[in-house]
UniProtKB/Swiss-Prot annotation:
GO cellular component: cytosol
Domain tRNA-binding: 577-679
Enzyme class: ligase
Subunit structure: Homodimer.
Transmembrane regions: none
Top-level taxon in the UniProt lineage: Bacteria
Catalytic reaction annotation: tRNA(Met) + L-methionine + ATP = L-methionyl-tRNA(Met) + AMP + diphosphate
Protein name (database record): Methionine--tRNA ligase
Length: 679
């Protein structure tokens, strides 16, 4: 017998900024099935994952909710962990990229790349939000498409005409965060010299590590010549600061795949039999597999292996890529109720229904998978309840009633037993190749043969005939043995059904090699229903609940075109949070334009016993700043001073409006005095 394989498996890291939906679950379910198959075969197979917990989106959402990014990612991780567990996804470790292990490994890999000459630095020009004091990623810039003039389009592509462009080509650009008009600024950035690994990647991507369709797509990138990859972002940013570079942070996609290593390292600290170096060092004999969606192939099949190569670590054995999920033949839709969250599904249906349906439709390619809800009901009810479970329910009663639950010995259908044994290698081969659909078809073909044989023997008719009891017991014992074989073959897909079947069969947890044996003169436990049919009404209720999720979200934003519709209310905060903000009346002593800044005014504010210097992006509404002098306004007086290019800003004045010329500086009623607290 060959030695057990050492295998490390990962799924792509879910982003810690939202809920898991059924599209996400396609990946985690297929990975889990493959891992369970390997463990069933006796291999050492470790499955790790983590939340992808860095980036501007997380920083900004936390700010909007009035919590820290650390609190946000902790809340999301708890939600994700619960959803995965209830879908029977059995990680050996589910960690976070915001961890000390990931910080250390990211710094190590960066340092090795830099020392080997694979890091370049140069100045880049980007849009900068003067109000938020941050550089803007493409998705945080909106404006008018330069091609078709559609408004409210993102900084890199138009959703209306499909055009792609540079953010600087966008007309009337606005910050999607503050509404301010962004300005162009230069910043020093760090780049990974991906072209250094062109030859290695051309060979590696054609070495059997990828499906042919994926390798062919990557060849387009490789043939056109690889470009250096920007791996840095400027503060403010939620992530890891680059060693020795204050105010510069690793781009989220730099440390995200390193999160695979970090999660495994975290697991190694709890399981001393695992050796991190044995899995990750160059020359490792362990196998490493990444399961990912086709939207992130470039990161995993170009950037990631190049980073590993340059830093002296091993590369993946294979990157297994899958397609997207559609529902009822179309993209998931919130309005149609087909954008279904994992928790919404679990509130209505059993997880194994979906696990089986995904398995039945998954091939080894990158084609999209369609969840047809009508077919879903029919297939699960027909295959699992009508075929597999039906065998046990047909036979168990006769054994308990006629022989006190004891299965007789002997083989009532040697040709059928041989057919089941002969099918095992092909089913195993399909599982290994991730061709789950083929495996399910072969298993259901066996179930059809078993049911046809039982129907032909008709033990229910024989039981009514004198002297036929031995034949009834032989038929039903054979039926239970065939059922047991099917359970073994389906165990990677249906772990709960398998556990319940093991309890009924009165056996220890089944392994793959148990299909080579039979139960004879063996006592069964009383049979209990192993799976119920899907009720179409429950599927309809799930879709309705998904629509309600959308309506609930819309209810928080008022209908119509009022100001709240344009700028919805932020999340509720506690009174203590509000009380921490010190609002004061301020007298504008001096107001003047700032040289070199299109939108800023420099205000000198009197707050009673002291004066403050404040920079404010209100110039577009107040082109003659001298008219503001002598006016009372309101300011946030305890805001931490912020160093800007033009000086230090010691607070923030309060204004309303969407921006541009529509900015309205707030003023207290007459009689208020500078320095008075606003309550």
């Amino acid at each position: 017998m060959s030695e057990p394989r050492q295998i490390l498996v990962t799924s792509a890291l879910p982003y810690a900024n939202g809920s898991i939906h059924l599209g996400h679950m396609l990946e985690y379910i297929q990975t889990d099935m493959w891992v369970r198959f390997q463990k069933l075969r006796g291999n050492q197979c470790i499955y790790v994952c983590a939340d992808d917990a860095h980036g501007s989106a997380i920083m900004l959402r936390a700010e909007k909710e009035g919590i820290t990014p650390e609190q946000l990612i902790a809340n999301v991780q708890a939600e994700h962990s619960s959803d995965f567990a209830d879908f029977l996804v059995d990680f050996d470790n589910f960690h976070s990229t915001h961890s000390e292990e990931n910080r250390e490994l990211s710094s190590l890999i960066y340092s090795r790349l830099r020392e080997a000459g694979h890091i370049a630095t140069r100045s880049v020009t980007q849009y900068f939000d003067p109000e938020k004091g941050m550089f803007l990623a493409d998705r945080f810039i909106k404006g008018t498409c330069p091609k078709c003039a559609a408004e409210d389009q993102y900084g890199d592509n138009c959703e209306k005409c499909g055009a792609t462009y540079a953010p600087t080509e966008l007309k009337n650009p606005k910050s999607a965060i503050s509404g301010a008009t962004p300005v162009l600024r230069d910043s020093q950035h760090f780049f990974f010299k991906l072209p250094d690994f062109q030859a290695m990647l051309q060979q590696w991507t054609r070495s059997g590590t990828l499906q042919d369709a994926v390798a062919n797509k990557l060849a387009e990138w490789l043939d056109s010549g690889l470009q250096e990859w920007d791996i840095s972002r400027d503060a403010p940013y939620f992530g890891f600061e680059i060693p020795g570079e204050p105010g510069k942070y690793f781009y989220v996609w730099l440390d995200a795949p390193i999160g695979y290593m970090a999660s495994f390292k975290n697991l190694c600290a709890r399981r001393p039999e695992l050796d991190f170096d044995a899995f990750w060092n160059e020359g490792s004999k362990a196998e490493l597999y990444h399961f990912i969606g086709k939207d992130i192939v470039n990161f995993h099949a170009l950037f990631w292996p190049a980073m590993l190569e340059g830093a002296g670590f091993r590369k993946p054995t294979a990157v297994n890529v899958h397609g997207y999920l559609t529902v009822n033949g179309a993209k998931m839709s919130k309005s149609r109720g087909t954008f279904i969250k994992a928790r919404t599904y679990l509130d209505h249906l059993q997880p194994e229904y979906l696990r089986y349906y995904y398995a039945a439709k998954l091939g080894r390619g990158v084609d999209d998978l369609d969840l047809n809800l009508e077919d879903f009901v029919q297939k699960v009810n027909s295959d699992l309840v009508g075929k597999v479970v039906n065998i046990a329910s047909r036979c168990a009663g006769f054994i308990h009633k006629g022989n006190e639950g004891v299965m007789v010995g002997g083989d009532a259908a040697p040709e059928l037993t041989e057919a089941f044994l002969a099918a095992a290698p092909s089913i195993a081969e399909a599982y290994e190749a991730r061709d789950f659909g083929r495996a399910m078809r072969e298993i259901m073909a066996l179930a059809d043969r078993a049911n046809a044989w039982i129907a032909d023997k008709a033990p229910w008719s024989l039981a009514k005939q004198e002297g036929k009891q031995d034949e009834v017991q032989a038929i039903c014992a054979q039926g239970i043995n065939l059922f047991r074989q099917l359970v073994i073959f389906l165990k990677p897909v249906l772990p709960v059904l398998a556990a319940d079947a093991e309890a009924f069969l009165n056996v220890a947890p089944l392994t793959w090699n148990d299909h080579l044996t039979r139960l004879e003169n063996h006592t069964l436990n009383p049979f209990k229903a192993l799976m119920s049919r899907i009720e179409p009404a429950k599927v309809e209720a799930m879709v309705a609940a998904s629509k309600e999720d959308l309506l609930a979200a819309e209810a928080k934003a008022p209908a119509g075109n009022g100001e709240l519709a344009k700028d919805p209310l932020s999340a509720e905060i506690e009174f203590d949070t509000f009380a921490a903000v010190d609002l004061r009346v301020a007298l504008i002593v001096k107001a003047e334009a700032v040289a070199g800044a299109d939108k800023l005014l420099q205000l000198t504010l009197d707050i009673g016993d002291e004066r403050r210097n404040v920079f404010s992006g209100i110039k577009s509404a107040y082109p003659d700043p001298s008219k503001l002098e002598g006016r009372l306004t309101m300011m946030v007086a305890n805001l931490k001073p912020r160093k800007m290019r033009f000086g230090v800003s010691e607070g923030m004045v309060m204004a309303a409006g969407p921006g541009g010329e529509e900015i309205y500086l707030l003023s207290p009623d007459s009689g208020a005095k500078p320095g008075q607290r606003i309550k």
